[in-house]
Design a protein with these regions (language model features):
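A polyanion-binding, active-site-adjacent surface
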Residues: 1-15, 24-245
Length: 245
């Protein structure tokens, strides 16, 4: 991929990539097994509703009207997505925080600002990628969602991926990696490794990496995220992305 502009170079500097001498380690490629989410009372209903949605607009409306989640009743807004739906690069985070719940958009707080700098470092912005979360509703007090709450959202997330038709997925954090891929490995074991996600008969390359909120708490690990972004940039260049279809 071509070098970012001088503006992006400044943003890349703010993201603090590691010294050039560190280089990149080879990335392992594995294919995850499919693990069904936990069954809950409303899971079948969520599957039926999600399956009937034929466009992203219909899916958004279905989520906003869905009454099978206690989290939705406690949240201020349904946080659906941001960025360009036409992009073939899709990012998936974990759940909205306070700022996202208030704005109705994903990644608008401090973690979102760091994410924008991270993506700018490889020449992307929200006009050239698409972003959503596993959970469209904020758990109270930013607590971790319980397995049943996550399971209720999985049919909508899977349909979201199918309708967005990405050519490359970047998973931000452990919750996203675990529930998109059906793997129980920790994010430190998964990050930087190319995996695959099936959409119909097509296998989509997937790269888990560290969540920006984690990087705010552990800035020394930004160098690991930078290696992952370099790997993503290489894959995008090979695929001719971020071309829109």
């Amino acid at each position: 991929m071509s070098d970012p502009s001088s503006k992006n170079s400044s943003l890349r500097s703010n993201f603090s990539p590691p010294p050039q001498g560190e280089g990149k380690k080879p990335l392992a490629a594995i294919t995850p097994s499919n693990i069904a989410p936990l069954a809950t009372d409303g899971f079948g209903s969520a599957m039926e509703i999600a399956a009937r949605c034929n466009t992203l607009a219909e899916l958004k409306a279905a989520l906003e009207a869905f009454d099978g989640s206690q989290l939705k009743k406690l949240a201020h807004s349904t946080v659906f997505a941001d960025g360009s739906p036409a992009s073939r690069i899709m990012l998936i985070g974990e759940a909205p925080g306070h700022d996202e719940d208030k704005a109705g958009l994903p990644f608008v707080g401090r973690a979102g600002k760091l994410l924008d700098r991270m993506m700018a470092a490889i020449g992307l912005d929200r006009s050239t990628f698409y972003i959503t979360n596993v959970m469209p509703w904020r758990p109270p007090d930013n607590r971790n969602p319980d397995p049943g709450e996550v399971a209720m959202c999985i049919p909508f997330l899977r349909r979201h991926i199918e309708l967005a038709q990405p050519k490359l997925l970047i998973l931000l954090g452990a919750v996203s990696a675990r529930h998109v891929l059906g793997l129980n490995d920790g994010i430190m074991k998964l990050r930087g490794r190319w995996l695959e996600y099936r959409i119909g008969t097509e296998m989509i390359p997937v790269l888990p990496t560290l969540h920006p909120a984690y990087l705010l708490r552990q800035p020394a690990h930004k160098k690991l995220a930078w290696r992952d972004l370099q790997a993503a940039a290489d894959k995008m260049e090979a695929f001719g992305l971020p071309a829109k279809e």
